[in-house]
Amino acid sequence: MSEITDVYAREILDSRGNPTLEVEVFLESGVMGRAAVPSGASTGEREALELRDGDASRYLGKGVLKAVDNVNDIIAEQLIGMEATDQVGIDRRMLELDGTEYKSTLGANAILGVSLAVAKAAAEEVGLPLYQYIGGCNARELPLPMMNILNGGAHADNNVDIQEFMIMPAGARSFSEALRMGAEVFHALKSVLKGKGYNTAVGDEGGFAPNLKSNEEALEVIMEAIAKAGYKAGEDILLALDVASSELFKDGKYFLENEAKPEKTADELIDFYENLVNKYPIISIEDGMAENDWEGWKKITDRLGKRVQLVGDDLFVTNTKILKEGISKGVANSILIKLNQIGTLTETLDAIETAKRAGYTTVISHRSGETEDTTLADLAVAVNAGQIKTGSLCRTDRVAKYNQLLRIEDELDVTAQFRGKDVFYNLR
């Protein structure tokens, strides 16, 4: 009864008002699975291709009708008759149909929408929640959230170079407690910013985006907010950064325009990070070096890799082949997992497994352009990832994922696990 009878895609809007893809997969039993595809603002060079129409007369060229047609006219007829429970077979069929390394024929957005909708339909068919269908009976660990409460870089129109300043409520005893702690710090930060006369408008991911005097002032106001909320920085709450340094890299140098000395070599940028790590309880730095600066990545890993989680996002783009290269060269110690960087659920699970076998931590992540789809919340629990990055404590597109995790925690009840600080198992 899990035989696929129809596959249908439509164009919808994401949280930034840009078109994206939604796919529905129908089974012989009458069951339907639906999934929507996210979209990034800062993207890695080697990400799978997000197919856009390029028609300036519609959505400023960002329409996805080509991807929609690829699902409805090409992919659908290939999958009708296949069993939805054959996730690997279905994903392989789509990869063969596309025939390119970066999914440039059909579009990774088209392929991913189908891949996720198939998994949702199959889970519904067998009567299991999505996280349990994907992960099995041992899928029960709720992730420590990495909450983006202050935005800069490509995620905000302000003068802060670093893209994301995040809090991690690592002292919490449960996911629900971590969420509450994060929300309280978020509201305290709004009060702190207002008190200093700063704008409290929010960026793409729900974090505040004020024009601060420096990158370090962002850390200072967050530290003040943590104290104002009644918590201890370094014990209850840890800090994390996403530098998105590929956006700052030009001609072999890094340019942080709002620093006293904007132009920095790789060594000078690592000095900058080391100084921040010594002054503030920073436990994680994402994309601290540019995606093509592998020498810089090796240097930062050698210097900070025992003290700080060094997350490769643009560096690895959820690609098992690139991740294996990084592991062999000893760069980074963690990988950010974004479903649409690679384009199928099967390949995503392969990347997670590869990382775990090498002792790399895994962080399941949203994109700046999100929808109400909550698949990544289920994925985080399915693979016992330990960490999730899904934005701030406002905007429904972000909060939807947190609320889904609350439901999962409630459903798991006493079997639910939450490791807090222990998710950083490879730091000593």
Curated annotation (Swiss-Prot):
Xref: PANTHER family: ENOLASE (PTHR11902:SF1)
Taxonomy of the source species: Bacteria, Pseudomonadati, Thermodesulfobacteriota, Desulfuromonadia, Geobacterales
Native species: Geobacter sulfurreducens (strain ATCC 51573 / DSM 12127 / PCA)
InterPro entries: Enolase, Enolase-like_C_sf, Enolase-like_N, Enolase_C, Enolase_CS, Enolase_N
Co-factor binding comment: Binds a second Mg(2+) ion via substrate during catalysis.
GO-annotated cellular components: cell surface; extracellular region; phosphopyruvate hydratase complex
UniProt: Mg(2+) binding residues: 242, 286, 313
UniProt-listed Enzyme Commission number(s): 4.2.1.11
Pathway: Carbohydrate degradation; glycolysis; pyruvate from D-glyceraldehyde 3-phosphate: step 4/5
Annotated family: Belongs to the enolase family.
Name under which the protein is recorded: Enolase
Subcellular compartments: Cytoplasm; Secreted; Cell surface
